[in-house]
């Protein structure tokens, strides 16, 4: 068996600026309880690529796709989308967020309010999600 050693340059580009990482961690803290209890994903730190949104399942146990979190807005959008998806699952309707009925929309907006009150700079993401732009 031939082993290949992979060299990593010490001067590789920083994953996030200090400001970007701080803002991602602020969003992570606001959504901490939601992130902790979700059975559908895990937010992990990698020294190689930064934060990774990992799609998982717990029954049955599986690991699916991993997506690198590019920014605080990226993380916030994914979390808001997951909150909305929880409402759609709760109502038993199998449709996209853009097709949510008025009662579903009211509940989604009510749940989003908890987070957006703490992260007002990201309120525009709610409209983007509802308009199918994300």
Protein language model annotation of sequence segments:
Residues 9-11, 32, 38, 57, ...:
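Intrinsically disordered, low-complexity peptide-like regions
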Residues 45-124:
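Acidic, low-complexity, intrinsically disordered interaction modules
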Residues 11-13, 29, 74:
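Intrinsic disorder/low-complexity segments
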Residues 15-45:
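Negatively charged, low-complexity tracts enriched in Asp/Glu with abundant Ser/Thr
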Residues 129-134:
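Short acidic DE-rich linear segments
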Residues 4-6, 23, 27, 35-37, ...:
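Positively charged, low-complexity intrinsically disordered regions
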Residues 1-13:
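Short, Lys/Arg-enriched N-terminal segments with co-localized hydrophobic residues
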């Amino acid at each position: 068996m031939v082993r290949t050693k992979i060299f990593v340059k010490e001067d590789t580009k920083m994953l996030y600026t200090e400001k970007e990482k701080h803002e991602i961690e602020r969003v992570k803290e606001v959504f901490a309880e939601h992130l902790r209890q979700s059975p559908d994903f895990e937010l992990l730190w990698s020294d190689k690529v930064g934060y990774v949104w990992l799609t998982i399942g717990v029954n049955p146990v599986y690991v699916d796709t991993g997506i690198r979190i590019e920014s605080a807005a990226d993380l916030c959008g994914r979390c808001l989308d997951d909150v909305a998806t929880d409402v759609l699952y709760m109502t038993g309707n199998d449709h996209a967020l853009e097709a949510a009925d008025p009662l579903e929309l009211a509940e989604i907006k009510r749940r989003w309010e908890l987070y957006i009150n703490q992260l007002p700079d990201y309120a525009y993401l709610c409209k983007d999600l509802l308009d199918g732009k994300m």
